[in-house]
């Protein structure tokens, strides 16, 4: 009887190892490509010596549209250039379990049902946990609102749809205009027919 329990236990261990490796490979795939991704902690630390805005891609391992962004949008040369030259680009797993200490507050993972969420993700997204979601922080770690009343930019975006938002923040246009007015004057590096503001 004891031997049969051990035999049942071995396949469970093997499955756990396979899924753990798959999850690790998936995380490493998020960090591959032309964008120089870093952790939230690394971006905050780097900001202490060289001030720069922070772009945060809030994702989860189960989010299909997050994977499409990783495959189609972030590898785009124009998107990667804007991110690398103007921001500290951060990948933040909204379900990561490690604590993060930021400005004297410890943000923790909150188990909920079969999954859970990280308190930092909830704070960044104003408790609107949908993925993918994108947050911009200024050089003093304040959230830069893209739309009036919204702290984040939710949803999948193609490169030509995403570029105006990145250039809006990178060029500090958010300090003097709203995104709707900016898009009317925005000059796209993509074809005019597929870009908001150039139709």
Go through the PLM ranges and name each one:
Residues 77-80, 84-151, 159, 164, ...:
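Thioredoxin-like thiol-disulfide oxidoreductase module
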Residues 1-9:
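Bacterial N-terminal signal peptides that target proteins for export
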Residues 19-25:
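Sec/Tat signal peptide C-region and signal peptidase I cleavage site
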Residues 50-64, 89:
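Short active-site neighborhood of thiol/selenol oxidoreductases, capturing the structured segment around
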Residues 26-32, 138, 144-199:
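Non-globular targeting/processing and membrane-anchoring segments
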Residues 67-71:
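Detector for the c-type heme attachment site
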Residues 10-18:
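Bacterial N-terminal signal peptides
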Residues 36-53:
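A short beta-strand-turn-helix
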